[in-house]
Amino acid sequence: MPRTQKNDNFVDKSFTVMADIILKILPTNKKAKEAFVYYRDGMSAQAEGEYAEALEYYEEALTLEEDTNDRGYILYNMGLIYASNGDHDKALELYHQAIELNPRLPQALNNIAVIYHYKGEKAKEDGDHDGGEALFDQAADYWIRAIRMAPNNYIEAQNWLKTTGRMQIDVFF
């Protein structure tokens, strides 16, 4: 059963109705509309914590979606699910695929940096100081890229870059 038929949340239901109306009036092909329906249902399932269901919808959306930017967003959302479930390697793979298709996704760059930072912390805890620092350097590279795209975001990352000496003065110019 499509998620649109079993959603009891008024806001989600309203969004679904509006999205359906927009889909009907937009001059786009049937395949693109169907891809959006699966993507929308994936977002709805993800918001409800139904991650396995969300991944199924996203996988189906990927088979139908032709627009590279939209495919990037689908992969990004899939990465969010894997990251929240602790599968950081799979999340990294999906985030990298997302920015390959849609380089204007600072949120994916940020999430890559967060994972590298986390892995750096773990490496240091395990006694691998050099490995941890290398992972911190990777995190810094991705945060700098994200901040260049969205300079008013990622304030904590900006502070970390400054306090660790990983940000040059002209990084945003």
Swiss-Prot record:
Transmembrane segments: none
SMART domains found in the cross-reference section: TPR
TPR repeat residues: 35-68, 72-105, 120-153
GO biological process: photosynthesis
Keyword Membrane found: yes
Annotated membrane topology: Peripheral membrane protein
Keyword field contains Thylakoid: yes
Top-level taxon of origin: Bacteria
Keywords: Membrane, Photosynthesis, Repeat, Thylakoid, TPR repeat
Subcellular location: Cellular thylakoid membrane
One Pfam family this sequence matches: TPR_1
Gene Ontology annotations for the cellular component aspect, listed alphabetically: plasma membrane-derived thylakoid membrane
Biological role stated in the UniProt entry: Essential for the assembly of the photosystem I (PSI) complex. May act as a chaperone-like factor to guide the assembly of the PSI subunits.
Classification via HAMAP family: Ycf3
Family: Belongs to the Ycf3 family.
Protein name per UniProt: Photosystem I assembly protein Ycf3
Originating organism: Trichormus variabilis (strain ATCC 29413 / PCC 7937)
Gene transcribed to yield this protein: ycf3
